[in-house]
Amino acid sequence: MARLKAPELRELDVEELERRLAETRRELFNLRFQHATGQLENTGQLREVRRNIARLLTVLNQKRQEK
């Protein structure tokens, strides 16, 4: 998954953010599994996905507090 940018995420609604968060968490699970079995070549993906999750959670919490 490409790097998610906060300004782009702020344009999305809460439901879409939650869907993307679930999808990204699934991706992190799969990457961790690949890493544990020695199949993951680019370990930097783990860091990128973790940071994407953090961005999603940040924007999601900001939107929830606006209400």
Curated annotation (Swiss-Prot):
Q: Which GO terms describe its biological process?
A: translation
Check the record and name the InterPro entries matching this protein. Answer: Ribosomal_protein_uL29 (IPR050063), Ribosomal_uL29 (IPR001854), Ribosomal_uL29_CS (IPR018254), Ribosomal_uL29_sf (IPR036049)
GO MF terms listed in the record are:
structural constituent of ribosome
Cellular compartments per GO CC: cytosolic large ribosomal subunit
Q: Which UniProt keywords apply?
A: Ribonucleoprotein, Ribosomal protein
Q: Which family would the database say this protein is a member of? A: Belongs to the universal ribosomal protein uL29 family.
Which HAMAP family did the record assign?
Answer: Ribosomal_uL29
Q: Which PANTHER family match?
A: 60S RIBOSOMAL PROTEIN L35/50S RIBOSOMAL PROTEIN L29, LARGE RIBOSOMAL SUBUNIT PROTEIN UL29C
Protein name, UniProt field: Large ribosomal subunit protein uL29
Q: Which gene encodes it?
A: rpmC
